[in-house]
C-alpha cells in the first residue's frame, strides 16, 4: 500500500518544494498539525514557522515559512506561503547560513516572543540531528 502524499510549497518566486512524502507537520494559526495520506479535506491559515517534512526514507527536511495557507486533500497538500527558506545544506557553513536566514525570515514576521522561542528551538534542535 502506498502511504505517500503529494506535497508542494509555492511562494511568489515559484515552487519551492514538490514531491511525495510520508507526513508533513504544519505551523497552523491555532497550533501545529500533522497530515498523512487520507487526511480529511481542509483549508487552514498558517503562521510563520517551520514545516517538518518526513520523506519516504523517514529522513526529515525543514523549511521555514512566512505566513500562508494550506489546502489539504486526501492525497495532496498544497502550501501557499509569502516566503520560504530551506533549513539544510551540503556543509556546516551553508547550514548555518540557511538557519540564520530562516530565523531572520520568521523574526521579521512575528511579534509573539513565545512562538519565536519555540520556532528557534525547533530550528536549533534540527541542526543537531
From Swiss-Prot:
It is found in: Cell inner membrane. This is ATP synthase epsilon chain. Coiled coil: none annotated. It comes from the Bacteria. Belongs to the ATPase epsilon chain family. Keywords: ATP synthesis, Cell inner membrane, Cell membrane, CF(1), Hydrogen ion transport, Ion transport, Membrane, Transport. It is a peripheral membrane protein. GO terms for molecular function: ATP binding; proton-transporting ATP synthase activity, rotational mechanism. GO terms for cellular component: plasma membrane; proton-transporting ATP synthase complex. Gene3D superfamilies: F0F1 ATP synthase delta/epsilon subunit, N-terminal.
Amino acid at each position: 500500500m502506498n502511504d505517500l502524499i503529494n506535497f508542494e510549497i509555492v511562494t511568489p518566486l515559484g515552487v519551492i518544494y514538490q514531491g511525495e512524502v510520508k507526513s508533513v507537520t504544519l505551523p497552523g494559526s491555532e497550533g501545529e498539525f500533522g497530515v498523512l495520506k487520507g487526511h480529511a479535506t481542509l483549508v487552514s491559515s498558517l503562521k510563520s514557522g517551520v514545516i517538518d517534512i518526513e520523506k519516504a526514507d523517514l529522513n526529515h527536511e525543514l523549511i521555514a515559512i512566512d505566513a500562508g495557507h494550506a489546502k489539504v486533500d486526501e492525497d495532496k497538500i498544497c502550501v501557499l506561503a509569502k516566503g520560504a527558506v530551506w533549513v539544510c545544506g551540503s556543509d556546516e557553513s551553508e547550514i548555518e547560513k540557511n538557519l540564520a536566514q530562516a530565523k531572520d525570515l520568521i523574526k521579521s514576521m512575528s511579534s509573539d516572543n513565545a512562538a519565536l522561542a519555540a520556532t528557534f528551538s525547533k530550528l536549533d534542535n534540527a541542526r543537531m540531528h
